Regions:
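Short loop/turn motifs that connect adjacent beta-strands in outer-membrane beta-barrel proteins
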Residues: 36-41, 78-86, 125-131, 172-175, ...
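Surface-exposed extracellular loop regions of Gram-negative outer-membrane beta-barrel proteins
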Residues: 1-11, 131-146, 154-188, 326-327, ...
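Residues on the lipid-exposed face of transmembrane beta-strands in outer-membrane beta-barrel proteins
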Residues: 1, 29-35, 71-79, 118-124, ...
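Beta-strand-dominated lipid-handling architectures at cellular/organellar boundaries
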Residues: 61, 105-108, 112-115, 121-123, ...
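Exposed, low-structure sequence patches enriched in small/polar residues
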Residues: 177-375
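Flexible loop and strand-edge segments within Gram-negative outer membrane beta-barrel domains
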Residues: 6-32, 36-117, 145, 151, ...
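Transmembrane beta-barrel strands of outer-membrane/channel proteins
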Residues: 1-7, 44-52, 88-96, 134-142, ...
Length: 375
């Protein structure tokens, strides 16, 4: 169980010291149980979340509330001597956004999202060093509430299904670690599509402490309500493309990572010391971002709204770490990004140009751990 939040006066930018009585409260509750049988683990879990917060003055909505809950049940086959291994799980995820329009005069504008997620995989061993796996995931997304224009019947949130098939081959020996597969993504209904992206990783180890690696991955990123909250809780859903009645919103399209390819080199020239340098390229279709909007000629307020465009990302980085006898650990990482958008460059304003992290862990005695970090 966890509760955290803030309540205080913040100075608004671009004003003569105007204050905002801001608050943001989060509540999280979790329960997780695992029962171990002879050859199977049964896991049952549940989660609850509640976020209450307000917007700055003169926003189109004054406050917002997110309520979420989910239930998980899964089995995990643990007999390592068996020729086949499998995992299976089912999840029920529920989420409600309470306010979803540009006019709070209507009392009930909540939108509820329900996701039924089923996942499973089967792995067959080929000797001691090789295996083949077939993984499958299906998401059924259902919407209710303020999802359509009752006057015209136009529907802006449509139920749909996504299906992910991920077959791959793995090799693991003293010199090579290979993972070769593909992500096959299908969507039915809203955002109907068929897409394929790579799922490949290769590592070559030499002299026991030097590694050359390359990887190319991708796949669908569901822009469900949970992801929207993680990206920008203050963001409003995009306005529906309708001129009949203002104030209706629609769901963003899902983001698809067509490729995220990188190459790198890891080395440990001294015991306990590791460094890693890497570079790569990422291509995102319908990349989700957000921007500030002041629609003074249409609505009576300003707001942040989610928006999308295709983006490219070139990145370079490095990291270094040192561990001394489980007493001292130091690590640092830096990544530089060069983002590009062909049509909506203003959406890149919230993209990170660089990311840096630094962590120190001190374990002087068995009963004491000291951690210091910066991100």
């Amino acid at each position: 169980f966890q509760m955290d939040g803030m309540d205080g006066k913040l100075t608004l930018p671009f004003t003569d010291g105007e204050k905002w009585n801001a608050f943001y409260y989060r509540t999280r509750a979790n329960v997780d149980y695992t029962h171990q049988f002879d050859q199977l683990d049964l896991n049952i879990a549940g989660n609850f979340g509640l976020s209450n917060f307000n917007f700055q003055p003169e926003s189109v909505n004054s406050k917002q509330k997110f309520t979420s809950g989910d239930f998980h049940a899964g089995i995990h086959f643990i007999d390592e001597t068996a020729p086949l291994h499998f995992n299976a799980e089912t999840n029920l995820l529920m989420y409600e956004r309470q306010h979803n329009m540009f006019n709070e005069s209507e009392a009930n504008t909540g939108i509820k999202e329900t996701i039924i997620r089923t996942k499973g995989d089967v792995t067959g061993a080929i000797g001691d060093q090789q295996s083949i796996t077939i993984a499958l995931e299906m998401n059924n997304l259902l919407y209710s509430g303020y999802t359509k224009n009752v006057s015209t019947g136009d529907e802006y949130f449509k139920n749909y299904t996504t299906l992910l098939l991920n077959p791959y081959y793995e090799l693991d020996n003293d010199d090579w670690k290979l993972h070769i597969g593909a992500n096959v993504d299908l969507s039915f209904g809203f955002d109907k599509s068929f897409r394929i992206s790579p799922d490949i990783t290769a590592q070559y180890i030499f002299s026991d402490s030097y590694i050359v690696y390359a990887k190319a991955t991708g796949g669908k990123q569901l822009n469900d309500f949970r992801r929207l909250e993680n990206i920008c809780p203050y963001g409003e859903l995009p306005e529906a493309n309708t001129t009949a009645t203002l104030g209706y919103v629609q769901r963003p399209y899902d983001t698809y990572e067509q490729i995220n390819g990188s190459i790198g080199f890891k080395a440990s020239p001294y015991p306990g010391l590791w460094f890693n340098v890497f570079g790569g390229y990422q291509n995102l279709k319908n990349d989700l971002s957000y921007l500030g909007f002041d629609p003074s000629n249409i609505h009576s307020g300003s707001y942040l709204t989610f928006a999308q465009d295709n983006t490219d990302n070139l990145y370079l980085g490095g990291e270094i770490s040192y561990d001394y006898k489980d007493i001292l650990g130091i690590s640092a990482k830096y990544t530089y990004h060069n983002w590009d958008s062909k049509t909506e460059e203003y959406l890149l304003a919230v993209k990170p140009v660089s990311e840096m992290s630094f962590n120190v862990r001190i374990h002087p005695i068995s009963a004491l751990n000291i951690n210091l970090g910066y991100d």
